[in-house]
Structure formats: C-alpha cells, structure tokens
C-alpha cells in the first residue's frame, strides 16, 4: 500500500479511517469483487473528506503498475440528496477545501487523479446529463472521464433515461446519506448501478439505522453490490444476510434487546463475551469514529427561561427524567390551553374507538405544535372540536419567542471587540400537515415578529451608539473599506459581476447588524478581518479563472470550459451571498426555493444576517451550520433519536469558529403527549448508541467528560467499530 500517494487530513482519526477503508477495498480488489464500505463516523467528524481521500489514494494505487495503461483521468460518481449539491460543490471546488490536499499532485502517477477532481460536473437533472458529451462503447452511450456530482433522485426517478449513469464504467462511487437507501437492492436502478460496476463504493451515514437495527442489514447489502456483476444480485444479498444474521451477531443483538427491557446478569455476560467477535466481524464493512459531544441541554418553561438539565439528559433513566419534569422546568399550560388540550384528547379518544379510527399520536403532536396546523387537519375541522385559544397564545410559540428574545438580549450585551453574535437554529416538524400550513411557516411568521422586535432593539441601539451624523459616517467608512478591496483585488470579476457586488455592499453597509458588528469606532479589528475575508475570496476567484485560462484538454475542450465556468460562477455566488441577506430571521424548508435556501445557508455561516434560521426536516441532514451558531432549539421532538442527533450535528461539528459548548433547548409541554415522546426517545437513544458506540474519545471539552456518553454499564457492552 505504500506505493500510493497519501493525504494528511490533519486529524489522526480521519487519517486512520480513510487509510483503513482504502486498505480494505484494495485488498478485496485482489481477491474478487471490490464492493463497498460504510463510513459511519459520528455527525460532524468529516466523513466527506475521508471518502474523497479514500477514493484519491485508491486511484493513485492503480496508477502504480496496477493497470496496463495509465489513464489521463478516471470516472468518479458522487450521489447526494438534492439539498446537499451546493455543500458538496463547495467542498470540491473552493480552494481552501479538499482541493488544497491535491495541490502538489504533479507527478505522472498523481496528475490524473488531481485532474479528475478538478473536472467536476454537476448533474441536477436530465437536461444537464444530456449536455455532457458521451462516447459509444459496447453500444452504450457513456459519460467521459471526470467527477460527476449527481442528485441521487435521478437514478431512481428517471429509470432507463439515466442509462448513461448506470452504464458508465465507474472507478469509484460515493453515496452520501446512505441510510435513506435502507434496502438498496430492492431498488432496480440502484441495483443496476452497483451490479454493472466493480467500483470502490463508499456509503456515508452517521446513522446507519434509524428506528430498527434491521435497517443496518439493508445498507450492508450495498457493500456487497459488486457480487451482482454477473447479474446474480441474490448473491450480494445472500452475503449481506450471512453477515447480519451471523450467529454471534444475532445472539448479541437479542441479549441487548432484553437488557433494555428486563436486564439479567446472563444477558450482560453474553453481550460482553460477543462484543469483540461481533465488532471484528462488522469492521470489514462498517467503521465508525465517535467523539464527546460538545452540548449542554436545557428545558424551557412558559416564560422562555431555560434551566440546565446537564449534558446527559438522553442518557438518563426514566425515573430521573420524571424527576426533572416534576421540578417545573418544562412548559406549564395555562388554564385555557390545558382545558383545550383535555377536551381535544377526549374527542380523539372517542374518534379512535369509532368506525373511522384516527391516529391519536399524530393529532396530539399537531395540537402541541400549533393550533393553526391542527385546525387544517380532518380532526381539526370536526364539528365537535372545542374552542381553541388564539394562535398567539399557543404555549410553545409564546415560549420560543421569549426564549429567542432572551438569547439575543444576552448576546448583544456580551458582544465584545473580539467575538461575534452567536446565532440560533430552530428545528420544527411538519407532523403530517400540508407544507402550506406547516409548522415552519406558522412559526416563521411568529418568529418574524420576534425578529422585528430584535431589529427595533438593534436600531435603538444604533441610535444610542451612533447619532445620525455619526451613523452616516460609520456606514461610509465600512463601504469605503470594502469597495477599496474590490478595486485592488477584483480584477477577476467579469461582465456585470463588479457592479452587482458593489450594489450589494452598498445595501449591506447600512444595515443595523453590519454597523453593530463592523463599526470602525467600536470594533476596528472586525472591519479589518472582514476586509481580509473579502480579499481572500476575490484572490481565490482570480486563481480559479487564471487556472481556467491556462488549462486545456484537447478531447473535451468545450466540455471542460463549460465546467470550469460553472465553478467560477459558483465561487462568485458564494461571495455575493455573504452580503446579500437582509432578513434577521430566515427559513430553510421545502417551501423555500432552492436558490433562496442556499443564500440563507451561506448567510447563516457568516457573522451577519440571518441571526435565526428556522429549519424543517430538509435542514436536519448534510448541511454545515456550525461556524457562528451556538444555540439549537428543538421546537418539536421526534420519535427517532437519530433525527435529533442529525439536527444537533449541524452545529456540533469540526470547523466551529466559536468556542465553548452548544446550548440545546427542548420545548416540552408538561403533562402532555410530549412527555411520552421523550421517554420513548430516550430508550431508543440508548439502543442506538450502544450498538454503534465505541470508547475512543477524540475530543476533550472543558466540563464535558466521558460520562456524557451512555451509562457505563451499557458502554462496556458497546461495539467498537473504530478503524485499527
């Protein structure tokens, strides 16, 4: 393995993971079908870079005499959910992201790999797929070499129309958020893709199973996909079943299941005895690094006051949870809200026992989310429905509004010359409602009211700090400094890019948040820092366009030119989005246009607007929101603890600029169905962390120790899937 070029990702656990995956896949290539491996690192540990480094080093291994003829480029396919296209594109093309690891790859053996990673094509739909010139081989139209960043939905929805993707001889395939596959070989198109390519396949997921461990068995099928090359997909499925239903694995899982219900000393002995053999068995197909989470949990009451309940809430026993709730830290319903809840629950009980049964749990969750959402349901339109309070009096909406106001009041008072305002991320759930009446929309309207109050407070603060004359002077100083950077370093801007950026900066310089954060008088260092950021972005764009002018490809010159232009446009849009957000509160949900979502996401990762991002399930996976965010608010709970893990992982990940733990707030209505959900979720959380946990602690955070993992008696039984 030493003959291949190695990459230093900067963190020992990442290097250990990708090198283990590379060695495992290369050794299989010498024996038979390559198949795949699951990279299941905890949320925020850098699976994207591990996968890219694995692919790059595997391909350089092939260049060292493994292939009869050296190739100028390779075929790499990256399948990602639609909402993650922008994130992956940034990682692949921005100079300070993954490309920096390949800068010195100039030898004959590494140049082909470097050029492949530079030759990025984005496949958003069938139109963009048809744009790429293919060539005929074995009567099939195949794609030319390059790295194809592709929406995963194309494979499933387009069927035979996407035959170019399935018939291209891929050297490597990366599938992000692979837990959505569940049973990939049940999908004919995915089955075709894996069965016709003996590609090194990497499946990325922090949560290999959601509610049932059997889902892990489904994903394991994809790691044996190479056995379907002969057309015998049943062989791939059979080998996955052999692994998942291995006698030791079955006995281990059954013992753990009994431990969570009626624990006995015998079950503990069984699990402890089988822990190492089962870990060794699974490590050939799945590897996982874990870290100590940097989180502090709070319960919020009806006044919006948060009370800390420790970093180990989800590892607590049911008795401890009951004691915590009894202490009065959750949301207490007022008399009107409590009466409405009891009457609706009685109505639902009658309907549940009637001829046309209704689902009690879903209806109660809708009621506890917002009254507006509940009124739009079939039950909510019932003639027997009791009178509900007005929307503005919903206990959760009142609580979250007061909480947000309190958070930013503290943030504003703690703002110093060397720090920034720490932002808040609010997660909501549709709970079966139509998108037009979704919780995120209703909460968004309510939160915008809070944002309006916050804006007024900021404007009053501006008037106090800056009299009108001085305010105009401060705005002018900020604008002059940023426009000077454009004049000195904006030579790469083409067409109308320069005036567009200048116009955006004129609006940006006069906003209250900008004056508060970049005031040359109050925070002189902040403006200099922002000038450096803009200068670096413009220089990166200049380097990209200079490289674009110097590079050439005789066979695919027109195609390569189109792809490089696309990369340059993406870099410019990234610069533009930093300064173009106006709303202090923004939404990231399915009802928001993709372009607007991308703008909000990029703005949230800057010190400026938006300060609050309200996200639905669309925003709980795959995106990075960690740079300036320190507050995560769970407006609704989920039955699935893996979803909460994914939510909090948007912020608890490497790359945070802010120091200290993340504050996680739970809104739970006392004496309601929320309490039931919390108990169920805690039990499932234990099962999830024991089956996929390990004892390798990667980070040490002040105030957070190893005891913030699962209870010690269960952690001693947890599988260790860390790479060796």
Where are these regions (language model features)?
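Glycine- and acidic-residue-rich phosphate-binding/metal-coordinating active-site segment common to enzymes
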Residues: 225, 660-661
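Amphipathic helical hotspot of TIR/SEFIR-family domains
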Residues: 160-161, 628-630, 647-648
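Helicase motor interdomain insertion/brace
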Residues: 1-24, 29-175, 179-200, 204-207, ...
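A short beta-strand element within the Helicase C-terminal
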Residues: 215-218, 624-637, 663-666
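Short, electropositive, low-hydrophobicity segments enriched in small/polar residues
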Residues: 50, 626, 653
């Amino acid at each position: 393995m030493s003959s291949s070029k190695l990459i230093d990702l900067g963190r020992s656990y990442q290097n250990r993971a990708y090198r283990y995956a590379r060695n495992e896949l290369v050794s299989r290539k010498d024996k038979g079908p390559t198949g795949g491996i699951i990279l299941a690192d905890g949320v925020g540990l850098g699976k994207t870079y591990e996968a890219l480094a694995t692919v790059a080093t595997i391909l350089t291994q092939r260049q060292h005499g493994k292939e009869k003829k050296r190739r100028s480029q390779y075929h790499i396919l990256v399948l990602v959910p639609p909402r993650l296209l922008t994130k992956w594109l940034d990682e692949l093309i921005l100079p300070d992201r993954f490309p920096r690891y390949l800068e010195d790859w100039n030898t004959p053996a590494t140049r082909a790999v470097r050029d492949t990673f530079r030759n990025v094509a984005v496949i958003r739909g069938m139109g963009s797929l048809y744009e790429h010139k293919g060539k005929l081989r074995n009567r099939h139209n195949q794609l030319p070499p390059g790295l194809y960043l592709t929406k995963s939905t194309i494979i499933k929805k387009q069927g035979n129309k996407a035959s170019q993707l399935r018939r291209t001889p891929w050297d490597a395939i990366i599938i992000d958020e692979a837990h959505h596959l569940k049973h990939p070989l049940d999908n004919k198109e995915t089955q075709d893709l894996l069965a016709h390519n003996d590609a090194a396949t990497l499946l990325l997921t922090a949560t290999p199973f959601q509610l049932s461990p059997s889902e892990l068995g489904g994903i394991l099928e994809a790691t044996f996909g190479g056995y379907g090359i002969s057309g015998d997909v049943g062989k791939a499925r059979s080998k996955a079943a052999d692994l998942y239903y291995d006698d030791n694995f079955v006995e281990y899982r059954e013992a753990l299941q009994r431990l969570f219900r009626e624990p006995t000393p015998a079950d503990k002995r069984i699990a402890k005895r089988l822990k190492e053999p089962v870990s060794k068995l699974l490590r050939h197909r799945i590897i996982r690094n874990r870290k100590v989470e940097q989180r502090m949990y709070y319960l919020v009451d009806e006044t919006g006051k948060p009370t800390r309940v420790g970093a180990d809430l989800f590892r607590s026993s049911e008795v401890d949870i009951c004691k915590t709730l009894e202490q009065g830290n959750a949301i207490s319903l007022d008399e009107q809200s409590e009466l409405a809840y009891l009457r609706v629950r009685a109505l639902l009980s009658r309907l549940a026992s009637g001829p046309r049964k209704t689902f009690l749990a879903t209806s109660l969750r809708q009621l506890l989310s917002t009254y507006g959402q509940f009124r739009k349901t079939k039950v909510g339109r019932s003639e027997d429905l009791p009178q509900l309070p007005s929307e503005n009096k919903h206990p959760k909406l009142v609580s979250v509004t007061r909480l947000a106001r309190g958070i930013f009041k503290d943030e504003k008072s703690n703002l110093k010359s060397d720090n920034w305002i720490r932002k808040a991320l609010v997660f909501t759930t549709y709970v079966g409602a139509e998108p037009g009446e979704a919780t995120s929309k209703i909460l968004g309207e309510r939160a915008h009211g809070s944002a309006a109050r916050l804006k007024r407070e900021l404007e009053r603060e501006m008037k106090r700090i800056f009299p009108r004359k001085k305010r105009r002077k401060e705005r002018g100083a900020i604008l002059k400094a940023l426009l000077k950077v454009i004049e000195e370093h904006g030579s790469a801007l083409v067409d109308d890019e320069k005036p567009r950026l200048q116009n955006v900066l004129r609006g940006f310089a006069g906003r209250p948040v900008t004056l508060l954060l970049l005031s040359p008088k109050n925070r002189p260092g902040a403006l200099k820092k922002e000038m450096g950021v803009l200068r670096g972005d413009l220089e990166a764009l200049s380097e990209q366009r200079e490289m674009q002018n110097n590079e050439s490809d005789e066979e695919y010159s027109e195609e390569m030119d189109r792809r490089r232009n696309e990369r340059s446009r993406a870099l410019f849009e990234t610069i533009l989005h930093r300064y173009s957000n106006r709303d202090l509160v923004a939404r990231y949900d399915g009802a928001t246009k993709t372009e607007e979502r991308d703008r909000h996401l990029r703005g949230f990762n800057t010190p400026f607007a938006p300060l609050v991002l309200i996200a639905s399930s669309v925003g709980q996976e795959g995106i990075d929101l960690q740079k300036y965010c320190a507050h995560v608010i769970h407006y609704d709970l989920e039955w699935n603890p893996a979803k909460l893990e994914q939510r909090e992982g948007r912020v608890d990940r490497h790359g945070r600029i802010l120091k200290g733990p993340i504050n996680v707030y739970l809104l739970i209505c006392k004496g309601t169905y929320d309490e039931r959900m919390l108990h169920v979720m805690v039990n499932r959380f234990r099962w999830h962390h024991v089956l996929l946990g390990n004892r390798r602690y990667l980070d040490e955070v002040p105030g957070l120790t190893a005891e913030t993992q699962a209870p010690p008696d269960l952690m001693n039984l947890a599988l260790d899937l860390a790479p060796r």
